Amino acid sequence: MLASANDIALQIAEQIGGSVDGFVQMMNNRAVELGCTNTVFTNPTGLPDENQHTTAHDMALITKAAIDNESFRAIAETTSYTIPATNVSGGERVLTNNFSMLNNTNASYYQYCLGGREGYTEASGSTLVCGAEKNGVSLIAVILQGASGTTAAEAVSLLNYGFDNFQLLSLGDNDFDIAYG
């Protein structure tokens, strides 16, 4: 999540799934478990494939599950990480999270952002998915087929609208009649 690294995504897939295809099957099974109804993965990188597809709703379900996972959330919120030197690398390496909404020197920085990912391919245009939390309310924004350079601003607008116009309500047992069948 810190740096775009499709080679690492493939290595992780092989390690966890036994093969890339095995991991992709795990991805598709998990998507179904999460309630996704129009998502088919064909690779762990997210790179275009004519048989791979999803919807904004399904991406929101996947993002919610990811952000609810404390380990994932800790990684997604990390802005940089230093990999110590090894006998192969010869020196330490710094990985920087390139998600603009987490970078406080970027115009797209959003203080309530929990993490996310943005990308671009010719097939899908600009895309972004992120989670944010403010005053105990958690929201997810998904932008698909966006115009280049606008997805973070669009996500901020959506999140601000949600935070400004919706609130959590607690309904007690006596606040409404319950019909039993």
Question: Can you describe what each PLM-predicted range is?
Answer:
Residues 1-57, 61-70, 134:
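Active-site-adjacent loops and short helices of periplasmic peptidoglycan-processing enzymes
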